[in-house]
Amino acid sequence: MPITDFNGNTFVAFTDISGFKELMKNDAIALEAIKYFYQTGFNVLRDTDNVEGFFVSDCGILFSRNGDNQTKLLSILDAVKKINKRMIERNYMLTTSISFGSFDYQGKIEFQGIEKNAIYGGAYVQSFLDNEMGKPKIQPGQCRLVKQNLPQLDIENIPLLVERGNDIQHMYYYWHLENPKEIQNFEKNYRDSYSLKYAGMINALKS
């Protein structure tokens, strides 16, 4: 799916496979995870009108192209939800950080033996840094929106995007739930399962 050049303010998501370093201890398992991640991302973006992106190693970069800011946010949340739901079916969890700001995609630069996408902009950098070293540390399965630089939005009409605990820097998107009334029970199950590491987290996300 070719991506045309883009330059403007939009929402950008940085997503990666949780626990990929552990998966890399077995080349076959790591390769299977990567292949499924890429295929899932390709299928979701192919069927999504307003979100584009690409995947490199264990990471994906998504951005919304058209519409007002509310539409852009809803579009990227929907894509993230679909990718996460398909990944969790194979017991793979993702972490996803979303930011708003400038984003510049300059197409594909081709060199012999390698392909590189030129991407620049505050939104991409902010999403990447939040995913890698944001505080509190993002946990497996989580998708969160960085509040810094957010435009005016009608958050009340996105009931599964909420503030969480004492974290004043983010809003969390509960992609796996259907009703905000389920959030409190999920959080309890997630905390209780954390000691079981990834197996327990997967069970909580699937419940």
Language-model features and meaning:
Residues F100, G122-K147:
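Catalytic/regulatory signature loops of cyclic-dinucleotide turnover enzymes
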Residues S75-D78, M93-T95, G122-V125:
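Short, well-structured alpha-helical interface segments that form or flank functional binding sites
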Residues G107-N131:
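Catalytic-core segments of nucleotide cyclases and related cyclic-nucleotide turnover enzymes
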Residues K82-S97, L129, K137:
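Aromatic- and glycine-enriched beta-alpha-beta binding-site module
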Residues M1-P2, N9, K135-S207:
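Intrinsically disordered, glycine/charged-rich C-terminal tails and inter-domain linkers
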Residues F54, D58-L62, Y92-K108:
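A short glycine-enriched loop-to-beta-strand structural element that forms part of the catalytic core
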Residues N66-G67, V125, Q148-L153:
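Catalytic phosphate/metal-binding cores of nucleic-acid and nucleotide-processing enzymes, i.e., regions
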Residues M1-K85, E89:
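Catalytic NTP-binding/metal-coordinating core of nucleotidyl cyclase/transferase enzymes
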